[in-house]
Amino acid sequence: MILNKEKIKNYAAYLYIKVAYDQAHSKMAHTVYFTNFYRSSKPLFLDEEDPINPCFQTISMGGGYVSGEIYRSDFEINDDARCIITTQSSAKAYKTVDGKTSEQHTNITLGKNSILEYISDNVIVYEDGKFAQFNNFKMDSSATLIYTECFGPGWSPHGSAYQYEKMYLNTKIYYDDKLVLFDNLKFQPRKNDESAFGIMDGYHYCGTMIVINQQVIEDDVIKIRDLVKEKYPDMDMIFGVSRMDIPGLGLRVLANTYYHVEKINAVAHDYFRRKLFNKKPLILRKP
């Protein structure tokens, strides 16, 4: 539910989206609320063969995160509802001038038999920037989640990467109230050599995809590996695919451009849209 006004005041911007299945009219009803720099597009319908699956583009009007600002998003996908949520463009965290860390908190709830495709663009942290992202998912075991994220260093006048102070990504997924995934990535290039073997292996961008659905099996892990190798045999990147303890898998990509990460994630996304929904690849039509 929407935060009360007093709690909303604690955030530089707040965004709330709720999607519910309207059985009487066979469509998805939605509620959108936002403050300050946050906006959301009206529901877009990207697939003419799937006219009741809305897509919401989240928009940050301020241009980026300024040091010390805290943003919050709450998304609720009710029982039997489905939607696509995506960012309009990459998020940018700029130089901190007072040592404070910019933060993004996102809380997502998925009800019974709900479906969420949450496709976020990359987070770019610029020189001297400090940024932390906290994602908390609470989902029913009958729900479906497809989620992507990526981060990388921003432009530096020195022409070198890893000039930011801190990048922290914290993702938790609760499955029937049980914590099944705790992904904790912390990068502090001024304290550690982030380009070293075993960390980023010399690459600049790190991308992640999570797919959770009752139909995901071990054979899907093998198929995703084979599809990526077959489609991009010469791409300069490293990737890995692992099955989770629940019906789901994780895909991690290290590459030198967000474009390459996006391409690898798209291979898996297209595969699961066909297998799980019998739908064609998703085209977000971003400028």
Curated annotation (Swiss-Prot):
Signal peptide coordinates: none
KW Chaperone (keyword) present: yes
tRNA processing found in the keyword field: no
Molecular function (Gene Ontology), one example: nickel cation binding
Gene Ontology terms: cellular component: cytoplasm
Subcellular location as annotated: Cytoplasm
Stretches assigned to coiled coil: none
Family: Belongs to the UreD family.
Record's subunit section: UreD, UreF and UreG form a complex that acts as a GTP-hydrolysis-dependent molecular chaperone, activating the urease apoprotein by helping to assemble the nickel containing metallocenter of UreC. The UreE protein probably delivers the nickel.
Protein name, as recorded: Urease accessory protein UreD
Source organism phylogeny: Bacteria, Bacillati, Mycoplasmatota, Mycoplasmoidales, Mycoplasmoidaceae
